[in-house]
Amino acid sequence: MHAKNDIMNKHLPFFLVLLTLFSCDISRNRGSEMYLPGPAIRDGYSPMGLVEELQYSGSVPGPTHRRMIVYLPPDYYRTERRFPVLYLLHGARGYETSWIRKGHVYQSTDSLWREGLAEPCIVVMPNVNQYKDDEDYEGGRFKGAWESILEVDGTVEYAFVHDVVNLVDSLYRTVPDKAHRAVAGLSIGGYQSIYLAANHPDIFGYIGSMSPYTWCKGRDHGYRKLFYGHLYQKMAAQFADEPPLGFYLYAGKWDIMLPSTQGIHHRMKRKGFSHEFSKYSAGHGWNNGWIEVYKDMLKKLFKNEDTNRNQ
């Protein structure tokens, strides 16, 4: 550990200069800035890889200052290699650090990288809320999950594809094709992952949906039409024209979303949509459930293509 800290201390000025120069260029051209995050973004842990916080201006009405956390493989700045990208989405009342503070994403990712069980990739954790700058509420009132989900077919989708994905591809050495992009999330983020991939099958080759929020409660607020209507039409086109390279669906045995997630699984199975469905021994929460599911999914990503591409 001391040797690792010595190495980081030795090279920290280089990274600071590099990021400062990079930030100036980004600010001038894209209205964005990159920072080395403080200890809070690291959750008191010293990750193997490099953590960067990217702040940028949104292109849709509403929030103007957006943030995302980018976790780079340990050798990112020591090689010319290009890497696949995993976009990891939070749930309701979440934000860009939820996977860090509650999901211990650095520890889980590092353990798999260390053992060679997962492909090195860039992990991007954006804030996909569109209510108020980087917060999951509006005017001090938490939005209901059903209100949040309606926004995926609109501002969230547009901002995610045009702001987040395009920005990441322009700033980092990615492999900018569907075979090297994954989108995954939990709860509302799990639903958003399905929907984003269905709307953009040419962009996302891998989908991970953990306990996707699909609870209507009988309300007639447009959500039923959104989910049970044209989503499956979009998925039919997706699987016919641009089939995913991997589609992973999860729900806990004591998960409030288990019945509806099983419904998605059975409907996909009837329609011949290739996917994997797994149940884990937990409920709808972080208590080992989503953390272990994340590790299971990460081991499966980017296995169908050679990701060891050079510039």
What are these regions (language model features)?
Residues 22-23:
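C-terminal motif of bacterial Sec signal peptides marking the signal peptidase cleavage site
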Residues 26-311:
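Non-catalytic cap/lid and distal C-terminal segments of serine-dependent acyl enzymes
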Residues 9-17:
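Sec-dependent signal peptide recognition
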Residues 18-19, 306:
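Prokaryotic Sec-type signal peptides and long signal-anchor helices
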